């Protein structure tokens, strides 16, 4: 009897069915998202999107404001959602999370909400899978971090007055990339900083302690 039980445990742990459960983890987190994260979508909307994506269909639904929201990417650990024409949402389950663990308390993920009006600016947050927010461990770069030392002072001050920074999560690893947005500058100012800005890449690490 013990051998049968051990065999069952082994088969469950390493079977394709178990791997499928692991792959579904990020979709389950998304399905349970609170209204503050996806205010335009009902839970049924999100479940429909997941079903469409998993059946290789366009995952677009009509949202509460009669606009359209589309789940663009859904993989084992990452998803990307176009919530509206002006809002893009990314979610990434961190690799130090244990997908096979029966306890969601050990799992952590990062979410990036990017709002464009029209230039994009992002908000970065960390959660456990019960949607308890975690302390912020990702440092939002300052404008000066993106600029070379010889950037014109007037351009530097203009960027500091309205610091618009876009963040993007990597689908392939636990990194986040920050890009300084310069579209609010004049054409002449943008010419002055050509080749004088850089992207900033950070590793995403979440603490277990809740806020």
Regions flagged by a language model, labelled:
Residues 86-88, 94-102, 108, 192-211:
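Extended alpha-helical regions
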Residues 91-103, 163-172:
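Structural signature of eukaryotic scaffold interfaces centered on beta-propeller domains
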